[in-house]
Amino acid sequence: MFNSNVKDVTSKEAYSLIKDDKEFVILDVRSKEEYDSGHIAGAKLVPVQVLGSMIDDLDKYKDKKVLVYCESGKRSPIAIDTLVDNDFTNIYHLSRGIASWKYDVTK
Protein backbone atom coordinates (compact mmCIF):
# COMPACT_ATOMS: atom_id res chain seq x y z
CA MET A 1 0.00 0.00 0.00
CA PHE A 2 2.76 2.46 0.96
CA ASN A 3 6.34 2.91 -0.18
CA SER A 4 9.37 1.93 1.89
CA ASN A 5 9.27 5.22 3.85
CA VAL A 6 6.04 4.09 5.54
CA LYS A 7 5.48 1.24 7.96
CA ASP A 8 2.06 -0.01 9.04
CA VAL A 9 1.95 -0.67 12.79
CA THR A 10 -0.58 -2.09 15.22
CA SER A 11 -1.64 -0.17 18.32
CA LYS A 12 0.67 -2.36 20.43
CA GLU A 13 3.65 -1.63 18.15
CA ALA A 14 2.83 2.08 18.06
CA TYR A 15 2.54 2.22 21.85
CA SER A 16 5.98 0.60 22.24
CA LEU A 17 7.53 2.92 19.66
CA ILE A 18 6.28 6.16 21.19
CA LYS A 19 6.87 4.99 24.77
CA ASP A 20 10.53 4.23 24.00
CA ASP A 21 11.25 7.31 21.85
CA LYS A 22 10.22 10.71 23.23
CA GLU A 23 11.28 12.36 19.95
CA PHE A 24 8.44 10.66 18.07
CA VAL A 25 6.07 13.12 16.39
CA ILE A 26 2.42 12.04 16.55
CA LEU A 27 -0.04 13.50 14.05
CA ASP A 28 -3.79 13.10 14.59
CA VAL A 29 -5.40 13.84 11.21
CA ARG A 30 -9.02 13.70 12.42
CA SER A 31 -11.34 16.65 13.01
CA LYS A 32 -11.03 18.92 16.05
CA GLU A 33 -14.20 17.40 17.51
CA GLU A 34 -12.77 13.88 17.19
CA TYR A 35 -9.44 15.02 18.63
CA ASP A 36 -11.18 16.68 21.59
CA SER A 37 -13.09 13.47 22.33
CA GLY A 38 -9.80 11.65 22.98
CA HIS A 39 -6.34 11.50 21.39
CA ILE A 40 -2.97 9.88 21.98
CA ALA A 41 -0.98 11.91 24.52
CA GLY A 42 1.32 14.37 22.78
CA ALA A 43 -0.49 14.15 19.44
CA LYS A 44 -0.64 17.27 17.30
CA LEU A 45 -3.97 17.99 15.63
CA VAL A 46 -3.49 18.35 11.87
CA PRO A 47 -6.82 17.59 10.15
CA VAL A 48 -6.25 15.84 6.84
CA GLN A 49 -8.24 18.55 5.02
CA VAL A 50 -5.71 21.24 6.01
CA LEU A 51 -2.50 19.20 6.09
CA GLY A 52 -1.36 20.47 2.69
CA SER A 53 -1.66 24.09 3.80
CA MET A 54 0.23 23.31 7.05
CA ILE A 55 3.09 21.39 5.44
CA ASP A 56 5.57 24.27 5.87
CA ASP A 57 4.87 24.27 9.62
CA LEU A 58 5.54 20.53 9.72
CA ASP A 59 8.78 20.76 7.74
CA LYS A 60 10.82 20.71 10.98
CA TYR A 61 9.65 17.11 11.53
CA LYS A 62 10.83 15.83 8.13
CA ASP A 63 13.75 13.86 9.55
CA LYS A 64 11.94 12.63 12.67
CA LYS A 65 9.88 9.50 13.16
CA VAL A 66 6.24 10.44 12.56
CA LEU A 67 3.23 8.38 13.65
CA VAL A 68 0.06 9.24 11.71
CA TYR A 69 -3.43 8.15 12.71
CA CYS A 70 -7.10 8.86 12.14
CA GLU A 71 -10.22 7.13 13.49
CA SER A 72 -10.07 3.83 11.61
CA GLY A 73 -7.19 4.03 9.12
CA LYS A 74 -9.10 5.43 6.14
CA ARG A 75 -8.10 9.13 6.21
CA SER A 76 -4.52 8.71 7.37
CA PRO A 77 -3.27 7.27 4.04
CA ILE A 78 -4.30 10.55 2.36
CA ALA A 79 -2.24 12.47 4.92
CA ILE A 80 0.66 10.05 4.51
CA ASP A 81 0.67 10.56 0.74
CA THR A 82 1.00 14.31 1.35
CA LEU A 83 3.88 13.76 3.79
CA VAL A 84 5.69 11.40 1.39
CA ASP A 85 5.20 13.89 -1.47
CA ASN A 86 6.91 16.47 0.76
CA ASP A 87 9.96 14.29 1.49
CA PHE A 88 9.06 12.90 4.91
CA THR A 89 11.05 9.69 5.15
CA ASN A 90 10.26 7.90 8.42
CA ILE A 91 6.49 7.50 8.74
CA TYR A 92 4.54 5.02 10.84
CA HIS A 93 0.86 4.44 10.14
CA LEU A 94 -1.48 3.28 12.92
CA SER A 95 -3.15 0.91 10.49
CA ARG A 96 -6.53 0.59 12.19
CA GLY A 97 -6.59 4.07 13.64
CA ILE A 98 -7.33 5.19 17.16
CA ALA A 99 -10.36 2.88 17.14
CA SER A 100 -7.83 0.07 17.69
CA TRP A 101 -5.92 1.94 20.43
CA LYS A 102 -6.14 -0.02 23.68
CA TYR A 103 -4.28 2.48 25.82
CA ASP A 104 -5.11 5.72 27.61
CA VAL A 105 -6.15 8.78 25.64
CA THR A 106 -5.99 12.46 26.55
CA LYS A 107 -9.00 14.75 26.38
Regions found by a protein language model. Give the residues of each.
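Rhodanese-like catalytic fold shared by cysteine-dependent sulfurtransferases
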Residues: M1-F24, K32-K65, E71-K107
